[in-house]
A protein has these predicted regions:
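N-terminal leader/linker segments that precede catalytic domains of diphosphate-processing enzymes
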Residues: 2-243
């Protein structure tokens, strides 16, 4: 299939323009989390994307969803509502980290990179864990219940940077505290709500493109059960399981 071909070519040529060194031992991938916010206030659903800084070593100038590396302290942040049980169960498969950590990372990174708040207003008596001071100062609490786990992807071996990324989707109207516009920052610029068709025309990492396809499937067939894909690569090519 076209997708198989695309994912296999990713393995041979690194997207960030860095030469793939075959002989070196592979780094263990670092846990990461990404949030795809979906708005449905127009005829076509739109997703929030931004352009990575050109100075980034990893995927410069590519359009991506907000997200980043899991900080172990993220799991300690307080939540208004926890993940739904079925979402939590899927995140536990072949994973040692507490599921809420991924959701909290996705929410923290979205806040840091776009200024948008997936949460509720509530005064918290306790001190915030590192990385959550600003949330705490604004009397905000993350809300995990709107997040749906839609996929997981591990960067191919022999890369200078490797991630084991969990992708979440959330309905903007339910998840966001208000309708403020996203604000460009150091990590992401040209932040915009784009239709899936327009998003596909942007310069995207192939895993981002793959997950946009998953979003399209979920939005087109809301009543069906959608099992999150788990993409990973080996020397013989890539494998896609469904969790």
């Amino acid at each position: 299939s076209m997708m198989s071909f695309m994912l296999n070519t990713v393995f041979d040529k690194d997207e960030d323009g860095v030469a793939v060194t075959r002989g070196v031992p592979s780094l263990r991938p670092r846990d990461a989390a990404t949030l795809i916010l979906v708005r449905r206030d127009q005829t076509q659903p739109r997703v929030l994307m931004g352009k990575r800084a050109g100075t980034n070593a990893f995927m410069p100038d590519k359009y991506v969803f907000p997200g980043g590396r899991v900080d172990p302290k993220d799991s300690k942040a307080i939540a208004w509502e926890e993940l739904r049980p079925e979402v939590e169960a899927k995140l536990r498969i072949q994973s040692r980290r507490i599921p809420r950590a991924f959701a909290l990372t996705a929410i923290r990174e979205t806040f840091e990179e776009t200024g948008l708040i997936v949460g509720r207003s509530a005064e918290m008596p306790d001190a915030a864990p590192p990385g959550w001071e600003e949330f705490h100062r604004l009397d905000l609490v993350a809300n995990l219940s709107p997040l749906v786990f839609i996929g997981r992807a591990v960067t191919p071996p022999s890369r200078p940077r490797r991630f084991d990324a969990r992708f979440f989707m959330a309905e903007a109207e339910q998840a966001l505290i208000d309708e403020r516009p996203p604000v460009d920052g150091a990590e992401l610029s040209d932040l915009q709500w784009v239709t899936l068709a327009d998003a596909m025309k942007l310069d995207l990492p192939s895993v981002t493109r793959f997950m946009l396809g998953e979003i399209g499937e979920r939005l087109a067939k809301p009543d069906e059960e959608h099992r999150p894909p788990f993409l990973r690569w080996s020397r013989s090519g890539h494998a896609t399981d469904r969790l």
